């Protein structure tokens, strides 16, 4: 069973690399299809369309994986991604580009189903470690992808999309050959599958008791959108960073997060337990946010990165807490819901935090980091509630 978890990790890394490959050149491709003044608007719309489709469809695909198994849904997701990138690589007109993003968003359950596969394949005591590995693989893919995409973009704006399609095709073959089904209690009932759309508005009965932890998950994902949306702008405004320094800081940010998630999450959760590991991560990240708000020199950011990376151990611990409180036949629904919440935060976070930054930067541009730290404090009363460590529903 652990072999399936390892294959799932490889697929997550390849999928993330495919996503990262296209980011540096998507604006360039858009310039071939629309006037220059419309590029930014369409770029944002394409990113939002993917995230919105994930909000709606990721929980549904997770439910399908509970009913029909992880393997067929994961294969469909990888095939959908390969088709999406192929369409985008050869898009002759703008609407075809939108169709490609729509297809990818609808079928893009790779992360959710991979997480369900890992939950199926690992015991409760080791899930935080494996979810940490998954976060590290995703981070490594998102570091390597943009770097490779930038190089391929020098050849052609279409080349990174072709490479992303090939990567997902390779992941598809990898899953076909090596991935074994890990959810063996599915199917065989003869009953029609009841798929619940808009699951965030109507949680499954088995997940409803975890509403408070879902709220914590969403808040933490929302906080993560502060650096995602404002790292470059803040570095340029506060420290007058140039492009090279911005790139170096982003590479260091991603690398330290991947290292901590891969090598610190497991030992720390084994020693402290998932709840205390989560609290440790929140404290480290919140402290890093406050220090960033008051940093006056660019070099100060780099030691602060260690605190932010330590904060990254909290999310795998929280994901393990949630997974340990759900039975095996609801892991897909759970992971799909978490993917939906993640994408919802990626829509709301940049809009809210960039608006806050614009409104407060004239007086002091550190407020957005203070607000992020305050949001962590909101989670503390919720986490004081007792939650079961293993609840089979």
UniProtKB/Swiss-Prot annotation:
* Matches recorded under Pfam families: MFS_1
Locations listed in the record: Cell inner membrane
UniProt xrefs under Gene3D superfamilies:
MFS general substrate transporter like domains (1.20.1250.20)
Q: Name one GO cellular component term.
A: plasma membrane
Q: Which cysteines are joined by disulfide bonds?
A: none
Membrane-spanning regions, if any?
6-26, 44-64, 79-99, 102-122, 135-155, 159-179, 213-233, 244-264, 277-297, 298-318, 341-361, 363-383
- From the UniProt record, which GO molecular function terms apply? antiporter activity
List, alphabetically, the SUPFAM superfamilies matched.
MFS general substrate transporter
> Which terms under GO biological process does the entry name?
proton transmembrane transport; response to antibiotic
Do you know which CDD domains this protein is assigned to? MFS_TetA
Q: How does it sit in the membrane?
A: Multi-pass membrane protein
Q: Would I find tRNA processing among this entry's keywords?
A: no
Keywords of the record, alphabetical order, are: Antibiotic resistance, Antiport, Cell inner membrane, Cell membrane, Hydrogen ion transport, Ion transport, Membrane, Plasmid, Transmembrane, Transmembrane helix, Transport
| InterPro entries per record | MFS, MFS_dom, MFS_trans_sf, Sugar_transporter_CS, Tet-R_TetA/multi-R_MdtG-like
Q: What job does this protein perform?
A: Resistance to tetracycline by an active tetracycline efflux. This is an energy-dependent process that decreases the accumulation of the antibiotic in whole cells. This protein functions as a metal-tetracycline/H(+) antiporter.
Q: Which family does it belong to?
A: Belongs to the major facilitator superfamily. TCR/Tet family.
**By what name is this protein known?**
Tetracycline resistance protein, class G
Task: Say which species the protein is native to.
Answer: Vibrio anguillarum
Q: Show the taxonomic lineage.
A: Bacteria, Pseudomonadati, Pseudomonadota, Gammaproteobacteria, Vibrionales
């Amino acid at each position: 069973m652990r072999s399936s978890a390892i294959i799932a990790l490889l697929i997550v890394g390849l999928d993330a690399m495919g996503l990262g490959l296209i980011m540096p050149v998507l604006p360039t491709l858009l310039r071939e299809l629309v006037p220059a003044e419309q590029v930014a608007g369409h770029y944002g719309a394409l990113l939002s369309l993917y995230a919105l489709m994930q909000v709606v469809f990721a929980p549904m695909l997770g439910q399908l994986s509970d009913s029909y198994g992880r393997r067929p849904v994961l294969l469909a997701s990888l095939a959908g991604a390969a088709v999406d990138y192929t369409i985008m690589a050869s898009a002759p007109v703008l609407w075809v580009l939108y169709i490609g993003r729509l297809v990818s968003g609808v079928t893009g359950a790779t992360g959710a189903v991979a997480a369900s596969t890992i939950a199926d394949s690992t015991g409760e005591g080791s899930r935080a470690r494996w979810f940490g590995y998954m976060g590290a693989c995703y981070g490594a893919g998102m570091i390597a992808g943009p770097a490779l995409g930038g190089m391929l973009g020098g050849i052609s704006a279409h080349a990174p999309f072709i490479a992303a399609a090939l990567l997902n095709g390779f992941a598809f073959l990898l899953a076909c050959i090596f991935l074994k089904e890990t959810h063996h209690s599915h199917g065989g009932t003869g009953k029609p599958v009841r798929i619940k759309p808009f699951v965030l508005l109507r949680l499954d009965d088995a997940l409803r008791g975890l509403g408070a932890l879902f709220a914590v998950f969403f808040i933490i994902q929302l906080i993560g959108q502060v650096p995602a949306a404002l790292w470059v702008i803040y570095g340029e405004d506060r420290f007058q960073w140039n492009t090279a320094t911005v790139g170096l800081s982003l590479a260091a940010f991603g690398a330290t997060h991947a290292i901590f998630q891969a090598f610190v999450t497991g030992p720390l959760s084994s020693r402290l337990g998932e709840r205390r590991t989560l609290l440790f991560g929140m404290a480290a990240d919140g402290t890093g946010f406050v220090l960033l708000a008051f940093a006056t020199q660019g070099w100060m950011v780099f030691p602060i990165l260690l605190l932010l990376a330590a904060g990254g151990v909290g999310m795998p611990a929280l994901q393990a807490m949630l997974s340990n409180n759900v039975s095996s036949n609801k892991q897909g629904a759970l992971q799909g819901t978490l993917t939906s919440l993640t994408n919802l935060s990626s829509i709301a976070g940049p809009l809210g935090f960039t608006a806050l930054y614009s409104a407060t930067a004239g007086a002091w541009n550190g407020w957005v980091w203070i607000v992020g730290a305050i949001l962590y404090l909101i989670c503390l009363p919720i986490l004081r509630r007792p939650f079961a460590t293993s609840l089979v529903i």
